[in-house]
Amino acid sequence: MPARTGKQYILGLRESAAEVFIHGEKVEDVTTHPGLRNGVDTLAGLYDMQYNSAIQGEMTYTSPDSGEQVGMSFITPRTADDLHNRRIMMTHWARASCGMMGRTPDFMNVTIMAMAAAGDYFAQNRPEFKDNIQNYFKYIRENRSEERRVGKECRSRW
C-alpha cells in the first residue's frame, strides 16, 4: 500500500470498524479500549516510521508503477542490495517492537509479493493465474487497505 501514517491507520480502524468482543462484551472502539489500544498505538508507531525523515529511505521505496512511496516489504528482491534493504526495514520494525510483535503489518505484503514473483508457477495449469496474482500484488501495493475494503453492503453476503 502507499506508505501511510499512524494517524491514517487509526482513522481506518475507526471508519471500518470490525465487530470485536472481549469477554462477551462488544468493544466500541478498538483504538481506545484498554486491552487493545497499546497494540494499536504500537502499530501506528511502526507506520509513522515510514515518514521518519531520518530512515524513510530505509522504510520505503518508489513504486515502479505509481511513483509513490510504498513500504519496503513490497520490494521483490532481484539483487543482494534489494534483499539487504528489505532486511534493514524489517530490523527497524523488530527493534521498535523489541521483537515482540510477531505479525507486523508487512507480513502479508511479503507473502503476496512472493506469490507474484512466482507467477510462472501459478500459470502452470491456468495461464491467466499469473496475471491475476501479479495484478493483485500491484493493486494492494498501490492502494491503502482502507481503500480496498469490501463495502458493508457486500460484507453482509459473506
Language model feature labels by segment:
Residues 1-63:
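Acidic/polar, glycine-rich intrinsically disordered N-terminal extensions of enzymes
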Residues 19, 146-147:
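Structural motif
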Residues 48-146:
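Internal helix-loop-helix
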Residues 147-154:
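Conserved small/polar residues in nucleotide/adenosyl-binding loops
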